[in-house]
Amino acid sequence: MFLSGQRETLYEAGIAYPSAGTVVGDKTHVRHLRFRYAMTNTGPIPSSILADLGIVNASTRAKHRRSLIDEFDAEIDQYRGIHTMVLSDEALFRYATDELAIASREFMMARFDDVEIVIYLRRPDRYLESFYSQHIKAGGRQTLSGFVEQNIDMIDYAARILPWVNQFGPKSVHIISFDRRNLVDGDVVADFASRCGLAGVGAQEKQPNQSLSVLGCHVLRNINLMYRRRKSRRPDHLRAIVSRSFSGAPPHLDSEIFASIVGDIRASHEELLGTVGSSIEGPFYSMSDMLRIPAADRQPDGDELAELGRVIARSVVEAYEHSREASSF
């Protein structure tokens, strides 16, 4: 949620969106990225931010936890007239575990009178497609099929949601079917803000987190591969260039990939409906929704498009490096 740029508006309404947990190294993120790492002693940490967090072992992980909690407490102590505090990070869903939910509950219940968890739940196949685009933006190099195979646990929604339900109770967990047609102004931020009693927040703000198009994923993936072979870090500017030039619908799962995961989707879907189905807001997706997708939309991208992505990637990198050399004179 992109509420970080609207802190003053929120604060005037008695809502805090803390800065604690958003800064990693020299970058400030729109989400509370560090919170998950502070609440757990296990779980993956991307190598791209590992050094910035200063976590190398269990001892430094515990130190990071204490540091982050101190940051939150110091910021909370400064609030005046605040009745609601918002924490936001999709990784709290993606990497949900009993350990994370238990530690989060201990942290929150010691500081707040009431905790409400809001989850906007996207259809599993669309979630994988969207997350693949984010994977490539973050420097990933996998093909779509390889990414799906490695991240199949992402679509086990029951495993992602039930730890929170078990710790906070079903009445505190609000699951909303992600369909822009049913959101306030078709916007997630505006919809969430309205649930906090705010109108007009987010709807006019252009969403910066647009997905890469099919060609965009090919282009940026090849740029990532080029810098990997050079054993150097991809310049952030290249991500911005490709994101601006090649935004759009991300690659769809082709028929072969979809067939390999439909059983996993069905099992988790049935478990989710059996446990919290009655509390889901909005028209929820069904298995038939995914099975009815036209075959034409599930076709592989093709070798020609992949080759075009490689050609454009080389051109983008060459142009970028040429401009840097020219500016140095």
Model-derived segments and spans:
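Anion-recognition interface
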Residues: 1-329
